[in-house]
Every structure is written in C-alpha cells, then in structure tokens.
Amino acid sequence: KSYTDTAYHNEELKSLTRYRFDKVRERAKLKTSISRLVTVLFPELEKLVPSLHMVSVYALLSEFPGAKQIAGAHLTHLKALLKDASKGRYRRDMAVEVRDAARCSIGSDMPAKSLELQHTIRLIRELDSEIEDIEVAIQAIMKEMQSPITTIPGIGFRMGAMILAEIGDFSRFDSPDKILAYAGMSPSTYQSGQLSLSGAYSHMEKRGSRYLRYALYNATKYVCL
C-alpha cells in the first residue's frame, strides 16, 4: 500500500476508535445510573441475576421499571417476557422468584425515577447500536490494513485498532521506551534539591495520548493472562 493509503487508513481509524472510546465511556456512565436507580426502585433484583446489565434484565425493567410494577405483573406475561429476552434461559421459576422478591421489596415507588430508568435503558440500547456500527467500520479498515497486531494473543481488533491508530507509523519510534513515553506510561522522576527518586518510587507520567495509554494498559492485562 502507498503511504497515502496508509495515512488515510490511520486517520480514519483514529477518528473511529476515539469515537468508539467516547461512546463506550458514555455508556459506562449510563450503566452506573442504572445501578443507582435499581438500588432505589428494586434493590433485591441485583442478587437475583448475574448482572443488571443483561438483555433480559433491561427488557424486564423497560416494561416494569420498579418493584411495585413487577409485583403487580401477571405471572404468565412475566414468564414469557423473561423467557424471550433470555432466549430460554429464564423460565417460570425465575419469574416467580422475581415477582416474589418484588412483593417483599423495600424499594421505593417513585414514578420519576422509574421514568428515568426506562429512558436510561433506551439510551444504552441506542449506544449499543451505535457502537456496533462503529465497530463494523473499524473491522472493515482493519481488514484493509491486514496488520499482524491482532495475531498477538490477547489483542482483539478493538484494542489492536486503537494501538495502530494512535501510534501510526511504528518506524517513528526506535525503541519500546519511546512508545511508552508517547503514551505517557514511562516512569516519572521526582527531584527536590539533592534528592532524585525514580523506579520503584515513581508514578506514570500520565501525559501523551490517553487513548493509547488506555489501549496499551488493557491489552497488557489480556496478553499477560
């Protein structure tokens, strides 16, 4: 590929990976809001499911946004909703357990919070769809670039794309240390008067590309497993 093609792909990839990064952060904040709202409206639910952030749980809370609404739900409808949303994983016993917990819940009946919960779930679903679209575009560029970075165990196309996008031309860096410095991950040195500390007593500088720093940090976690 020509330099122009490579530069174009890098710029496109950078735009897409940064856009995805911002969308994922936005979604994470909304998920925190979901947890907060459930604690108010139906705190017992969290102990009944592996995670609040599941398709089946969102389907339940979209239609019945609180313990009071779930407590008054018809069991047949509740069972069908959970079964469909979980693709058969949750059946009648789960519906009974959830409704019984709702009927004994200490959760508050707050219509405003219930409405906020429904709207937050809707926003998360929209973000899920947007992130999926972005990832399709990222994968298309990664396929064009044919980089070997994703052959490294633990590095998928998301992290690989972000690393490629932020570093660009690897030949610009003559050592791994230079890449770490560019990411703001090189140890800082504290100096005061005659005292100079580095190594075990230092912290990361946290300058440079926060996107690259995020990608390298997360990639390292999986590569080291």
Whereabouts are the PLM-identified features?
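A detector of single, family-specific signature residues
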Residues: K1-L225
